Amino acid sequence: MLKKAAIFGLAGVMAVAAGCGSNKDAGNANSNEAKIALLTTTTGGAAAYGESIKAGAELAVSEINADANAVKINLLVEDTKGDKNEAINAMNKVIAKDKVVAVIGPMLSGEMMAAGPVANKSKVVALGTSTTAEGITDIGDYIFRNAVPESLAVDTAIKEAHKTLGFKTAAIMYSNNNDQMVSVNNTARKALESVGVQIVDTETFADKDTDFSAQLTKIQQAKPDVIIVASLYQEGALIMKKMREMGMNQPVVGSNGFNSPQFIKIAGDAANGVIVGTPWFPNKEDQKVKDFRKAYVAKYGKEPDQFAAQAYDAVYLYEAALKKAGSTTDREKFREALKNIADFVGVTG
């Protein structure tokens, strides 16, 4: 069972940098329909996140387009493959060739760090639904997110876990070629130090690694009370399985990457004892959440996860901004409208 240690809502989380500037309209033969690009990862090691994001976004679009009072959306999906160069190429394509009014994505923090400047320079809004690393919204005035940053999620998860478990020592294990996980390491160190926890070991690995024996042996020798793991779901699940196989039964605080059903599917019983912060609570007594779950299950035959929920919210947030802007093509009006939305409530909060 995956334990949820902290509750987060989106209110006040979406960081917005104020600014101004002229901009060209997005080209669109049908002025009653807005072209929105979704840059996500549907192939590669992070595909489970991307498939959920795509599913959540497409469900929202289908609902919006069936509503006579809504602004119609034409969603153009690009697979970035979890690769920074692919993300840059996709961003250039949807802005210059497809002439979208705005972009959702890219999916990974590293992709946004690479492709976000392209959108910002072109004065096209790009909103990340799962870009949780530090510095995302510092890219520029056109970069937004509705993802809970690791600086909040991991910090709170560690501090709440410390209140309950009272651990005195910790080890950190993170992917050092992943911008998001490097960010988690920085946040985790600050959070642990702030509550007087001694960090007895830090180990690194790379995305797509499959053998973690050497790192875990060193951590085992350090005998920490708790282990912080920052990884995507595949690596995280393999780390958990190897830990339990080695007799390491310490509680684990995981990064946002653990918030995928695939993590539990791969890790199995080894996922027991994991603590992770999430903005998504499917059992919340809220009609929007109930309706979303019902529609998602009816369309896809499975329950939505956090990534689907955040993408679903992003599309509805964009529709609200389009309506407020009064245009389906004016990129600058869209940005101003999005920046000034203060009362949006979605399925994640």
Where are these regions (language model features)?
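Short, low-complexity disordered leader/linker segments with a strong preference
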Residues: 1-35, 66-69
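Beta-alpha junction/loop-to-helix N-cap segments that form part of ligand/metal-binding clefts
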Residues: 24-26, 49-53, 63, 67-135, ...
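Extracytoplasmic "Venus flytrap"
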Residues: 37-56, 78-85, 107-108, 173-182, ...
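Hydrophobic alpha-helical segments within soluble ligand-binding/sensing domains
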Residues: 87, 146-169, 182-184, 211-212, ...
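Extracellular/periplasmic bilobed ligand-binding domains
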Residues: 119, 185-277
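An alpha-beta-alpha
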Residues: 143-204, 226, 318, 322
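Extracellular/periplasmic periplasmic-binding protein-like sensory domains
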Residues: 243-312, 324
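Segments of small-molecule ligand-sensing domains
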Residues: 299-300, 304-308, 320-349
